[in-house]
């Protein structure tokens, strides 16, 4: 496959996933409340980092929420945080906040009054174009987390006139096989896509699954363990290509 690098503007992206707001961790009511508040603090710091780093685009690659039963107060909090941003934000539903009937995204439209917020809703995949940034973002919404759902199925050919970013939420397989895990992402799909960057979610540890000339990364869960957590900053330029670095949430 021939990769052609046409001149394009530089681009700076924040990539996160697996925030799992309002996760059920068991314990007392006080422990549950403390965990909820910690999750909210993490999302605030993600937005703070996007503003401090002056990113052009924010990608949330699945499982922003831990389940579809979160209360309206959590939805209002998330909306308030998204409203702090003015750059485009793309949200991909994951397996915990999948796009089935009565999902979070049926209850609340995060783009209402916030046209910079975009939720991937098409089950067969959709492309969002941002001409001012010279970037296209593709993703496929998840309705069911099953082995037959392939997050990168129907990925179209890249547009060489723009940066091409695909989003996916699922389990990575280094080789083709009959998947025993749901929502499989195969190494050859990554390699053969030819896209500039694959913004992935589901693995809770930062993982580089780049294949050939295609950069593909899981940022890890920003609330995993007791450390402050990190996100990924992805810098695109025609001179240096795609550079990925961890940024702390402190």
Model regions: which residues?
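N-terminal active-site segment of His-dependent metallophosphoesterases
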Residues: 1-77, 160
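Residue-level signal for beta-strand positions within conserved beta-sheet cores that form or flank
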Residues: 9, 133, 240-242
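Residue-level signal for pocket-adjacent positions within structured domains
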Residues: 16, 217, 244
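Generic beta-structure capping elements
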Residues: 16, 140, 169, 247-249
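Short, charged, solvent-exposed linker or helix-capping segments at domain edges/interfaces
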Residues: 25, 148-151, 242-246
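His/Asp/Glu-rich metal-coordinating catalytic cores
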Residues: 57, 67-229, 235
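C-terminal functional module detector
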Residues: 224-250
């Amino acid at each position: 496959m021939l990769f052609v690098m046409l001149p394009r503007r530089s681009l700076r992206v924040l990539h996160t996933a697996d925030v799992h707001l309002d996760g059920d961790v068991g314990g007392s009511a006080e422990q549950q409340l403390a965990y909820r508040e910690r999750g909210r603090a993490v999302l605030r710091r993600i937005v703070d980092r996007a503003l401090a780093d002056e990113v052009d685009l924010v990608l949330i690659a699945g499982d922003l929420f831990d389940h579809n039963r979160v209360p309206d107060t959590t939805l209002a909090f998330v909306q308030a945080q998204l409203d702090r941003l003015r750059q485009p934000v793309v949200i991909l539903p994951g397996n915990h906040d999948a796009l089935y009937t009565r999902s979070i995204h049926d209850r609340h439209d995060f783009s209402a009054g916030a046209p910079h917020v975009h939720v991937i809703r098409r089950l067969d995949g959709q492309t969002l174009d941002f001409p001012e940034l010279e970037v296209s973002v593709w993703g496929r919404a998840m309705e069911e987390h099953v082995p037959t759902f392939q997050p990168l199925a129907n990925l179209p050919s890249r547009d060489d006139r723009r940066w091409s970013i695909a989003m996916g939420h699922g389990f990575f397989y280094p080789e083709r096989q009959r998947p025993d895990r749901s929502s499989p992402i195969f190494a050859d799909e990554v390699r053969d896509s030819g896209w500039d960057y694959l913004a992935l979610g589901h693995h809770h540890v930062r993982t580089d699954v780049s294949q050939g000339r295609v950069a593909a990364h899981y940022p890890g869960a920003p609330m995993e363990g007791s450390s402050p957590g990190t996100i990924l900053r992805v810098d695109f330029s025609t001179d240096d290509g795609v550079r990925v670095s961890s940024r702390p949430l402190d």
